[in-house]
Design a protein with these regions (language model features):
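Short cytosolic juxtamembrane segments of multi-pass membrane proteins
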Residues: 1-6, 177-191, 563-564, 654-663
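N-terminal Sec/SRP start-transfer signal
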Residues: 1-30, 193-198, 207, 242-291, ...
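Hydrophobic alpha-helical transmembrane segments of multi-pass inner-membrane transport and secretion
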Residues: 17-45, 52-88, 108-122, 236, ...
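Hydrophobic alpha-helical transmembrane segments
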Residues: 19-23, 58, 153-158, 198-202, ...
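Short helix-loop junctions at transmembrane helix boundaries
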Residues: 38-50, 120-152, 209-226, 597-660
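Hydrophobic alpha-helical segments
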Residues: 110-254
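Basic-flanked hydrophobic alpha-helices used for secretion and membrane insertion
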Residues: 311-548
Length: 663
């Protein structure tokens, strides 16, 4: 046993250039996972909106675990490939596959144990710092109680222990299926130079074009949400196809150019690239996808966090927002004065200074509209609207306007997508002429709705007719009285809202058969900060993780290719190639392909921008200028990191191929 343990430890030590990043990856993944689980298990009431925060953090921990599974398998494949010659020598010297398997078991036990123990220790140490950071981004006072989550420790130990067990089983299976000769040759075996596959390249272009078209053509946020994940899958598939097939085609074209190819700075780099391009293309595509994930996630969550005050203000334009629903339209129009008096009396009983009060009655129904004709259920989701009819007198009173309408005319309120038809019709021939577009007064606003709002201002004497037409659609009609007003001074975030509480008490005391909802800006602001703060925190954490994964892939890619190119450059030096020529050739190779993932990730980000903007509308965030700023800043920061990694890995590659490495 001591022999196997010694050989395993000696193998890790001698291959520290490859094992140290692998161990650090495991430590980082385990610590990040524990931190997310520990934060999700904080005592109830520690964070605002704790229900949504817990869901977000649990989802983030699941995403991190799945990503860790893929990344650790990917990086371990480099280790095994590098160790195959060593295992073959053990086999030639008399060790059987069982002995090699025992060495692998000890290596997995040592590397997995170090990663698990180091990750859990680091996670426990940093979890309090992460908790303080999360509370900071939510604008809360710090709680200095130190907690260790036993459930988080057990979950991290179990799930990541399972990953290392799967990695071990995969390595053992590979050894069992290989012969000593195969193991000896496997390190030197590169990819066969594939032929340029124009069909796959064309498929990649078509998929990417289709995804980009979806991104720029979809207008409605709900439609964008429906198609978002399909577009993501199309972009991922297209990126892999283009890098694998397109890069081969590029190298073949370069080889056909004698002026470029037969220069000593290009000859070695291009010929080695085309020899390994299938694997190289997949690695570059992975880097591009990870970079795009980082850019989209970082820009969107940062925009949400810094726009956290805009969102509740969009969702709740007034400090207090009251909605009362009636089943019967006649009851609504009879009782609205009493409702107004009840709300005003309740608010003033708490010393409220009511400002900018707006109230109106409405009838609303979920319909579809196409070419100016309203229809019931069954239409396309892109045609879905929440149609609302408001009496002209209510609109004028709420907005301080003096609009007039003749019979058969309506105004349409401005919305997310302005209504462009000249008429508004119902099945059966009933139609109204659109006199013009006016400002929206709905207390929730069009921006607060998942589907598009279509609000019509109707003559008072015709509101009953339109209500009956809506009822005939058989989709249900919601009849309500809405009231919103601001306060002279809003309550503090942690003090509750006595005005909202008084209004609820007043409405509960009524004997009417009504439903009501009282929404307070001050009461709900904490939920916004909780949700957006946790999303921002999770976005930062996962962005760091994905960025480190991209760095790790780049590092292993460069190191492994450096070892493979070592013999080629050694031959070139023997026939007269200088170190300066080697450096020039390396720069040519790296510059040729290294920045392609960054450029394509930037292109993906540009076309993803409309998609992200539409999705942020579902979070009540309309600040396009802020999103542009966070997107540009995210790309700039990632580009700087990418360039630094390029310089570091090119230096490591150069030392391996020029100095003989550490074979």
């Amino acid at each position: 046993m001591k022999l196997y343990r010694h050989l395993a430890w000696d193998g890790i030590r001698k291959n520290s250039r490859l094992y140290v990043p692998y161990l650090l990856t495991g430590v980082g993944a385990v610590s990040f996972f524990y931190i997310l689980v520990a934060l999700a298990r904080l005592p109830e009431g520690t964070l605002p909106g704790s229900g949504s925060v817990q869901v977000i953090l649990n989802l983030g921990s699941f995403v991190l675990w799945v990503f860790s599974l893929l990344l650790l398998f990917y990086t371990h494949s480099f280790l095994i490939r590098r160790r195959n010659r060593e295992f073959a020598l053990y086999n030639v010297l008399g060790m059987g596959k069982g002995d090699i398997s025992r060495i692998l078991c000890w290596e997995s036990l040592l590397s997995g144990g170090l990663s698990l123990l180091g990750g859990l220790a680091l996670g426990v140490v940093l979890s309090k710092l992460a908790e303080l950071g999360l509370m900071r981004v939510m604008g809360l006072e710090a709680d200095m109680t130190y907690r260790v989550s036993a459930g988080g420790l057990l979950m991290a130990l179990g799930l990541y222990g399972a990953i290392y067990l799967l990695i071990l089983l995969s390595a053992l299976l590979r050894v069992r299926r290989s012969t000593a000769i195969q193991l000896m040759r496997s390190e030197a075996v590169g990819e066969k130079p594939p032929r340029a596959n124009w069909a796959l390249a064309l498929l990649g272009v078509l998929l990417l074009g289709a995804a980009y078209y979806l991104a720029v053509s979809i207008r409605e946020p709900l439609t964008a949400l429906t198609w978002f994940f399909a577009a993501v899958l199309m972009v991922i598939a297209a990126t892999y196809l283009l890098f694998i097939s397109g890069s081969v085609t590029l190298c073949r074209l370069l080889q056909r150019n004698p002026r470029f190819y037969y220069r000593k700075r290009h000859f070695v780099s291009v010929s080695s690239l085309v020899y390994r391009m299938k694997r190289n293309g997949a690695g570059l595509a992975s880097i591009c996808i990870l970079g795009t994930m980082v850019l989209v996630m970082l820009s969107s969550t940062t925009c949400l966090y810094f726009g956290a005050e805009d969102s509740p203000r969009t969702r709740y334009p007034r400090a207090e927002n009251v909605t009362v629903w009636y089943t019967d339209r006649e009851d609504l129009y009879r009782d609205h004065s009493d409702l107004h008096a009840a709300v005003v009396t309740a608010a003033r009983s708490r010393g409220a200074q009511m400002q900018d009060l707006r109230e109106y009655r409405s009838s609303s129904s979920a319909l579809t509209v196409r070419n100016g004709v309203l229809q019931g259920a069954g239409g396309s989701i892109s045609d879905a609207v929440q149609f609302t009819a408001i009496p002209l007198s209510d609109y004028n009173a709420a907005m301080g306007a003096r609009l007039t309408l003749s019979p058969g005319q309506v105004y349409i309120c401005h919305g997310r997508s302005d209504y462009r038809e000249s008429t508004l019709s119902f099945p059966g021939g009933a139609a109204w002429q659109v006199k013009g577009l006016v400002d929206n007064l709905a207390s929730g606003g069009d921006s607060a709705s998942v589907v598009t709002q279509l609000t019509a201002i109707v003559p008072d004497e015709e509101i009953a007719d339109m209500d009956r037409l809506m009822e005939g659609m058989n989709t249900g009609v919601s009849r309500s009285w809405s009231c919103g007003f601001d306060l002279g001074q809003e309550p503090a975030r942690d003090e509750g809202d006595p005005v909202a509480a008084a209004i609820r008490e007043a409405l509960v005391s009524r004997q009417d058969d009504i439903r009501f909802n009282v929404e307070s800006l001050s009461e709900n602001r904490g939920d916004f900060y909780g949700s957006y703060g946790s999303l921002f925190f999770l976005g930062i954490l996962l962005s760091v993780g994905f960025s480190l994964a991209a760095v790790l892939i780049i590092y292993y890619k460069q190191i492994s290719e450096g070892y493979e190119d070592q013999a080629r450059f050694d031959i070139m030096q023997k026939v007269g190639m200088t170190r300066r020529d080697i450096r020039s050739s390396i720069n040519s190779q790296l510059l040729l392909v290294f920045f392609l993932p960054l450029l394509l990730a930037g292109l993906h980000l540009v076309f993803a921008f409309p998609f992200v903007h539409k999705l942020l509308l579902l979070f009540n965030l309309w600040n396009t200028r802020l999103l542009v700023g966070t997107t540009a800043a995210s790309f700039l920061a990632f580009a700087v990191l990418y360039t630094l990694v390029y310089r570091a890995t090119s230096t490591a590659y150069y030392h391996i191929v020029s100095d003989g490495g550490d074979r």
